[in-house]
Amino acid sequence: VREVLLLLFLSLPFTASAADAPWWGFALHGYPVTETRLAGLKYETGLAPHVVVFFLQWPSHGETGPFPEESLEAIWSQRALPCLTWEPMYYRDGQEITILADEILGGKYDAYLRDFAEHARRWGRPFLIRFAHEMNLDRYHWGTDRGGYGPESPQIYQRMFRYVVESFRRFGAYNVRWAFCPNAESVPYGDPSAVWNRPEAYYPGDDVVDVLGMDGYNWGMTKTREKDGWQSRWQTFGEIFENLYRSLTRLAPEKPVWVFETGSMNAGGDRTAWLREALSLAREWRLSGICWFQVDKEVDWRLDIRRDAEAVGIVRGGPPLPGYGSGGGE
């Protein structure tokens, strides 16, 4: 039954009705994802997700790298849909090194792509790949070095995205579905010379995108110009996502829309009220899913049932969670 439901979900296009609550998920930091970690997640949050987002970088060379079968199996065993955020970069001496588009398009990583696609095909079950997410942030500058991030970046990104998807199709990995996922706010922004950095400018085409995604956060009042170099403010879910949501649905109105990373702090407002509004607006917009960034990173975004019981209750009021009965009882 579980496999049938997930296969039905991936029989796109899929758009929730206004009466449907979105699927609930968590985005997790660290690799691999194990059944032990997922059990800890359920204990910590009181929630068993429909979707689990995780992250994997590429190898520094163009040969084979790890295929995340352990993580995929662990997520699947919990009756959840895996979503791999696949980052074309690697770490060297603690620094992120972005893989250049010329290396990917020139064939240096063809062996890696073939090996990964063939492993995905043999694994056989459906999962999402969120390739090179948040491409409209100069923090990533996918396909170029930081100095090369500029007006040519959208076209570079499109070529990379299409090349990767077409490689998977060439090797029969049709169980993989592809997510295009910009950030809610583009950086650089506010600069007339950066008008090229609109999320929709990066869109690689309907034929290689199955799911539309959005990332964005409410930092509340946690950041100050004096300490952090920028001033955060309280933002509602609607303030964060509406402009991007409207842009994406104009771009591809028949494709499902997900929030793959979000979270809210309490500083400056009420996180529980924020989450309530988020889920209400998600129904109105017919979002297919919302994934909470369950990570202690720049700030501690994590939900914890011991301090966030009311917020957890709001989430449990949605569709029955795997491992829970309707209404949220275990």
Residue ranges and their predicted role:
Residues 19-32, 127, 255-330:
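Substrate-binding cleft of secreted/luminal carbohydrate-active enzymes
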Residues 19-111, 264-266, 291:
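N-terminal substrate-binding region of glycoside hydrolase catalytic domains
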Residues 66-87, 207-267:
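Glycoside hydrolase catalytic-domain groove-lining segments
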Residues 38-48, 66-84, 115-124, 201-207, ...:
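Acidic (Asp/Glu)-rich catalytic clusters
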Residues 3-15:
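Sec-dependent N-terminal signal peptides
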Residues 62-65, 69-176, 180:
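Substrate-binding cleft of extracellular glycoside hydrolase catalytic domains
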Residues 27-28, 161, 165-197, 254-267, ...:
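Aromatic-lined carbohydrate-recognition surfaces of secreted/lumenal glycan-active proteins
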Residues 183-213, 269-279:
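Substrate-binding cleft/loops of secretory-pathway carbohydrate-active enzymes
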